[in-house]
A protein has these predicted regions:
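N-terminal hydrophobic or amphipathic helices/low-complexity stretches enriched
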Residues: 29-75, 118-119
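His/Asp/Glu-rich mid-to-C-terminal helical/loop segments that flank catalytic regions of hydrolases
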Residues: 283-341
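Alpha-helical metal-binding/catalytic segments enriched in His/Glu/Asp
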Residues: 116, 128-181, 326
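Secretory targeting and sorting signals
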Residues: 1-29
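Structural recognition of the beta-strand scaffold that forms the well-ordered cores
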Residues: 52-60, 96-98, 113-117, 125-129, ...
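Metal-dependent peptidase/peptidase-like ectodomains
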Residues: 46, 123, 174-280
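Extracytoplasmic/secreted proteins, especially bacterial periplasmic and envelope-associated proteins
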Residues: 42, 51-54, 58, 75-90, ...
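A non-catalytic alpha/beta surface segment that caps or lines the substrate-entry region
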Residues: 61-118
Length: 341
């Protein structure tokens, strides 16, 4: 996650004018109507915290062997990418690298995104993404190996399941997030007007295993924070909220903050967006402790952007819950149909 934020309403600098549709974009298609009743049990059962932790341990090993981090443009990032690509290829995907450069403190950084996709129609493409890079101060296991592991495991188990999606799902592992959301912005910038119009949903995972965390769902209907977001974002929020409610699990809304995570470029392009988050340097309240446990007056993740963001800095129960919710939402939108009208 690029910068400090709190999911608390009193501290939110809400990006009220975030929806600025890219010049030349074709009219957006009708929002997808997700399959809330989709049978996602088999996929959710296959996506386990145990297997996700294997990915996190591999990325921890990469950081340990490369100066303690996996920052974009570094050998640690390259080895992280190779690990993700090897896993995807073994499952039958054909991952591709999308290269780009940016300047950081006077230095030109060369890096890339990794993209891998399922079959299905590209007229209503679903992008499921999270950033692969870490800060240079630490290995970035909660931020954001946790999101990467959940996305990767969803992709692998989806391939194993033989699910044939109606809508193409593109799994994206972004580079250059920590210095300025460069990877996701590059991806959106490279879309033609017609391609942008074919992007129906963006699901973002950034920090989903915070040790003192909360189950946060992005406010897709603007009812809590007044976010001005693309039509269809409310459907994403509803899928997640309904999923957790059906399991008796409490959630709280969190705002979209401009420049905070990889959803920013998609929102600005008018692409319906949503996702999950468990907290960073913000302080957990007493009310949140009542609903989620943990310790009041302490950060959701005290190791946010620090060297202690290691494999020990992970709540595996929360990781399992968020990963299962992602698997459910991915299938719900992969099997969705456009709204009439």
């Amino acid at each position: 996650m690029k910068m400090h934020r709190s999911a608390r309403a009193g501290l939110a600098a809400v990006a009220a004018a975030v929806v600025v549709v890219l010049a030349g974009c074709s009219a957006a298609p009708p929002p997808l109507v997700p399959t809330h009743s989709a049978d996602t049990g088999a996929l959710r059962e296959a996506v386990s915290a145990r297997d996700i932790m294997d990915h996190l341990e591999a990325l921890q090993d990469v950081a340990d062997a490369n100066g303690g981090h996996r920052a974009a443009g570094s050998s640690g990032y390259e080895e992280s990418a190779r690990y993700v690509e090897e896993q995807l290829r073994a499952a039958g995907y054909a991952p591709v690298r999308q290269h780009f450069t940016y300047e950081d403190h006077g230095e030109e950084i060369e890096t890339f995104n990794i993209l891998a996709e399922t079959g299905g129609s590209d007229e209503h493409t679903i992008v499921v993404g999270g950033h692969l890079d870490s800060v240079r101060r630490g290995p970035g296991i909660n931020d954001n190996a946790s999101g990467v592991g959940a996305i990767l495991e969803t992709a692998l188990r989806m391939a194993d399941s033989g699910i044939e999606p109606i809508n193409k799902v593109r799994f994206a592992f972004w580079g250059g997030e920590e210095e300025g959301l460069y990877g996701s912005q590059h991806y959106v910038d490279e879309l033609s007007g017609s391609e942008a119009g074919q992007h129906a949903v963006y699901l973002n995972l950034d920090m989903v295993a915070s040790p003192n965390g909360v189950r946060f769902v992005h406010d897709g209907d603007g009812s809590t924070f007044g976010d001005n977001v693309p039509d269809g974002s409310n459907e994403i929020e509803d899928v997640f909220v309904d999923y957790f409610a059906d399991r008796g699990l409490e959630v709280l809304p969190t705002p979209f903050l401009d420049g905070d995570s990889d959803y920013a470029a998609f929102l600005k392009a008018g692409i319906p967006s949503g996702g999950l988050f468990t907290g960073d340097a913000g302080t957990k309240s007493g009310a949140e402790v009542q609903g989620f446990g943990g310790e009041a007056g302490v950060a959701y993740d005290s190791c946010y952007h620090e060297s202690c963001d290691t494999i020990e800095n992970v709540d595996t129960d929360l990781l399992e819950e968020m990963a299962d919710a992602l698997a459910h939402a991915t299938i719900a939108f992969a099997t969705a149909t456009p709204a009439e009208g």
